Each structure stands twice: as structure tokens, then as C-alpha cells.
């Protein structure tokens, strides 16, 4: 190969030599390709002819075989974007770069998230490419105070606005002369006075628009800066032309439009300031989450307590937490007992009792006892850090509903410039033939009324505020896509154990004396069965002292048999009692049947071959489960329960909470198939679960909802995480989605409607340029302000909410 390039790809998913051989063979089948795949290093080295192939082709080939190519993700801060055309252009350019798998640019957060192949490109190249487009870019620094940076930028905008307003206000008086035929001092109408005021506004305050326009045009793009620069320049330089005519005596009453250019720039700066101020409020939820983090920790070193910064805590460190202090990091209690306020994580205001070996979560509040703990997760691995990461990703992601606005934004400015040019031609040739000024005014109005900003802000601002508000209530959406999909859900499938129920069996009924209970708990205390644990805990709550068993024997399918202090104990079902010739009184038999019908596990107890008690154990239904399911029904959503339990137990639980559809006796591997069956009926299905065996069903469902108290596998597989396990958050999540999508539609309707109506009105000459500029400035502000209404939304579902 005369013209060759070499690249190295990190491959994931290979398990043996057959994998590496398969990939190597497939790559080498491509023309002019020489590939070697190393299983040990998990790398593929590929030599190829760049005229025939590119790296993406090799990546696609590897992925088609079922393997992955390692991708790195970087977040970039971008400044200088003024409208949707800017963010769309940067996104388009990044996605065309070699080695970039996917790039999204968010105008609201002023950030880009880029997934790239490290063998082909790196973060510095991405930054350089953005800078070449005329914007400032840097790799996001998580330790940098973004709030103070934005506050400084906002202050800078305010100063420029004030200076521009002071210079423009005297010129504004001229507009009142035109509108209301007012008398004003001659100084205000003096061309030199107007020139002196308007020029610094145009070329010092407004220089940013020229710079932005130049950078965009140089790179083959166009944005809002182009519209503002062209529109205000037309007014300003026409005024210069008229002023020259006045100076050389060609006219005694020059038609000046200095006030138009200056007031336009001031109004646009005013709109941008209001927009930036409103946008800064959209990230409040994230700021509140960050403020929850502890700042320092008390570490035990050589027997002494030392306060250290939080970032110096390592896994395995021994920490001491006193009453009223925040738990610094995730960990496990090794000494002491206390109550922990976990409301920031679960929303539950009642403190949770914690003892030795219990886990504690960083940033929760220690209420009343000094504890010693071992750090198990620190830094970015803590529960709060993961919550913040999920919220950040959701707020910077794009919803599919945004695609139309993105497409239009890419063509918006050139179309508007074309309409403005056409307006000028029509006016000067047909409407007012040969008269320059009306044509100029109408075309300037078209240029300045058009607003690509409103289009670009319509979706991301709503997503930011909506996901932030949801996070404040313990609902974590993993992205805008899932916010949009959730509002379409018409069927919710709930796993039973750990989702509808607490997942921990407890004693619900006991008939017998304390001696029988003591013997029963002693017999069960060495068993690892969850039912045995429930019985032992029940006895401990009664403060009974457990002794030791002399003999113990499990009777498969029947129960247990034990000897304790010369007492013979039998615990089990009817069959066990019958086999030992122990008769059941009718009332005991009726109780047993009643418990079993309610889905409880009932056990008979006999001491020395005499029936002495009956105990029932069940996995109890969660608080508010019934209310949550009623709310879902009120919203017009069908609710089903999916469980591996037998039908009787499942029906009993379903009856308690008001679920009509029960899918029972399902093996874990069959859960995903049951979801698919519902989807084949045309239903949009959400699956709610908490265990490892729920993960495939969570992935298969249109929306997977994980209970935050569940396993990491389930949470990773889900699209939404409900913190704390309160089922009332499920209808709230759906309502948050519906409210956010409704808000986005309002924003898009306003953004599209404003431009569709405003541009023709301006072209007809019905709006003065300064009125058009004011309308443009306020259009994007109105979109952001409407999105901010979501901050106050009450997550209370409406009946049959559409």
C-alpha cells in the first residue's frame, strides 16, 4: 500500500482467542487493509488506505460483530454562543470530525458533551476546532465555581447595558417626536449630537455583534449577530450618508436613523441580559444539590481527631461524625448508634435509626448520636455525586422534540436575510417606487424582528428546569429523551417484591403465649431464611431471651423440628401436624385458611406434641402504594403486577393495593418477554423494579423505572430512578414529564408563531425597527420565563391528564 495510515482501536467485549481472530479476519477482508488484533492488550492495529477507508468503517465493522470500541466522553464549556444557529453549527462541525462518535451542544448550559474515540482525536483537538469557529472553549473543570463565573458574566452584561441605555435614551426622545409630535430641545435633533451618542453604541458596545457576525460568516455560517450587525449597520450608515448630504448642503433636513441603530442595540442587550439572568435560575436545582455536600470530615489518625477537607478522604479511612454534622462520605458504621435524616435523598422527613454495620450516605444529617464509620465510597463514587451526575447529564441532553427546531435554526438566518432583501426590492420597486427610506426601514424591521434564539431555547430550558424540579422531589430522569418518552406511557408494570412491598417479611399475626414465641424464635434463630429472621426480630421486639437448640432438623416441604431445654418443638404446615397426630381446632384451621388467602405464610406451632400457637409472616405493602396506584388509575394509566410468586399470594397483594391485572408464576428470565407481549398490543409500557432480575425487563420497557433502594444493576438499566422507594413518586414522575413536554410545546408554539407572524408584519412596514427589536429581545426572554414556571410546578397529577 503506497498511501497508508495506521490507527489503533481499543476493543471491548472479547473473551477468548476466537473473538480476536474473528475480528481480525473480518477487518482483513476489506480491500487494502492489514489488521492485527491482540487479545491481551484488547487492541486492534489497522493499516489502511485512507482514500478507500476511514476509521468509522472499522468501528462499524467491529460493532456489527457484536463487540465495542472504547469511547471517552468530555464536557466542554463554550462561551460566545448567542443563538440556536451558533449551537447548531458547533454541533454539526464536531459531529463531522474524525473520531467523534456523537456530540451535543446545549445553548442554555453553554456546554458541549462529546463522545469520541481516543485513538482518532482528543479533547484538545475538539477545543481547537471550536475556537477556529470563533468561540471560546475549554475542558469543563468540575472544581471551578461555575456560579461565580456566570455571575461575573451577568455583571458585565449589565454594565454594557447601562452604558448603552444612557447613550441611547436621548436618542429615544426623537422617536417620541415622530410618534407624538412632541417638542424637544434643538440639541436632540442636531445631527452631530446624534452621531456622537450613536457611534460608541454602534462600534464599542455593539462591537460584539460585528465580531460574532464576522466569525460566523468566515466559517460559512450565520447567526443572530449577522442579523443585528446588518440591520443596525444599515440604519447607521444610511444616517452617515444623510449627514454627509447635510454637511455639503444637499439637504437641510437629513432623515437620520441613528436612534434606530442605537436603541435596537440597547433593546437587544436588554433582552440578552434578561435572558442570561433567567437562564442562571434554570440551574438552581443543581446548585442546591451541590450545596448539600459536606465540606470537611473528622478523621481518626493515631487516636486523634483531625478535621480535613472532604477531597482528602480515602476509602478505608476511619471517620467520626457528631450530632448535627453531615455524614461526609458514604460508609458503614463500626461503632455507635444514631438516627440519620435522609430527607435530602429520600424525601422522608422521619430520621432513620442506624446501628453498627448499617450503611450511611454522604451529605445526610446525623441527628442525635456520635458514630464512628469507615469510608466505603468517596469523591465521584458517592450516592450524592452520582445523583448530581445524572441531573447534569439530563439537563445537558436533548429531547427528540428539539430536532425540528435544530434543523430550522441551521437555515433560519440565511432565509431571513433573503426575506429582508426581497422586502427591500419589493418596497423600492412596487410599494414606494424609487423611495429609499421606507424600503430600508421595512427591511431593517425584518432583520431585527427575526429571533433564532427563541427557537434554540424553547426545549433545553424546559428540560433543564423540569429535570431539576423532578430531582428536588427525588425523581432522576437520565436524559431529555426519557422525559419526552415518559409522557406517552399508558401502562405501568410493577414488580411485587421490593417495589409494591417492602421486600422484608415481618410478623403480621401471632396467637400464642410468650413461652411459645420464645421457643419458636430460638428454633428459628440459626436459620438464614427471611421468614425465620422476621420471627426472631419479632421476639426481640418483645424483649424475649433466646436460648440454644439441642437438636434441629428441617423437614422438607413441611417445616422444622427441634429440641430446646427438653421441649419438643414442631413448626410448619398442616401436613407436619397431621404426620405427628396433632389435631387442629376449627377456629385455628379457619385462621390458617384466612391468612393463606391473604397471601401470608402461616405456620402452626406445637410444643410437646400439643398445638400452642399460630404465626403469620408476610412481606407487607409499602406505605402509599395504594394511593399511588389510585393516582395512576385517575391519570388513565393501566397498572399491572408482575411476580414470580404464586397466583394466590399475588392476587392477595394486588387486591390490597387496587391492581386488577396480575401476571404471576413468572420466572425472572420471562419478565422481559411479558413486557414485549404488552408492547405488541400497542401499549407504551413502563416497568418498575428494584432487583437484578428486573434489569432485562427495565431495558425492554419503553421506560424503565428503578427504585432507588434497589440494586445498582437495576438502577444502571433504568431510564428513571426513584430515590427512596416511595411509589407516590411514580405518578409524580409521569406528571413532571407531561408538564415539561406541555411547557416545551408552549415554547415552540410561541417561538415558531412569533417568527411566522412577526416577519410578514415587519415586511409589510407595519412595525418600526425599534418596535421590532424590542419584540425580538423579549421573545427569547418570554420563552425562558415560561420555562421557569416549571420551578413552581406542583407534582400533583391531574385526572386523565393528557
From Swiss-Prot:
Induction description: Induced by copper and, to some extent, by ferric and lead ions.
Catalytic activity, EC: 7.2.2.8
GO cellular component, one term: plasma membrane
Signal peptide start and end residues: none
Effect seen on changing residue 19 to A: Abolishes copper binding
Record-listed Cu(+) 1 binding positions: 16, 19
Compartments, as annotated in UniProt: Cell membrane
A Pfam family it matches: Hydrolase
Bridged cysteine pairs (disulfide): none
Residue span(s) of domain HMA: 5-70, 72-138
GO annotation terms (biological process): copper ion homeostasis
Assigned keywords, A-Z: ATP-binding, Cell membrane, Copper, Copper transport, Ion transport, Magnesium, Membrane, Metal-binding, Nucleotide-binding, Phosphoprotein, Repeat, Translocase, Transmembrane, Transmembrane helix, Transport
Cited Gene3D superfamilies: 3.30.70.100, Calcium-transporting ATPase, cytoplasmic domain N, Calcium-transporting ATPase, cytoplasmic transduction domain A, HAD superfamily/HAD-like
Residues involved in Cu(+) 2 binding: 83, 86
UniProt GO MF annotations: ATP binding; ATP hydrolysis activity; copper ion binding; P-type divalent copper transporter activity; P-type monovalent copper transporter activity
Residues that span the membrane, as ranges: 161-181, 192-212, 224-244, 256-276, 411-431, 438-458, 748-767, 771-790
Active site feature: 495
Membrane topology per record: Multi-pass membrane protein
Binding site for Mg(2+): 690, 694
InterPro entries linked to this entry: ATPase_P-typ_cyto_dom_N, ATPase_P-typ_P_site, ATPase_P-typ_TM_dom_sf, ATPase_P-typ_transduc_dom_A_sf, HAD-like_sf, HAD_sf, Heavy-metal-associated_CS, HMA_Cu_ion-bd
Function of the protein: Involved in copper export. Can also probably export ferric and lead ions.
Assigned protein family: Belongs to the cation transport ATPase (P-type) (TC 3.A.3) family. Type IB subfamily.
Protein name: Copper-exporting P-type ATPase
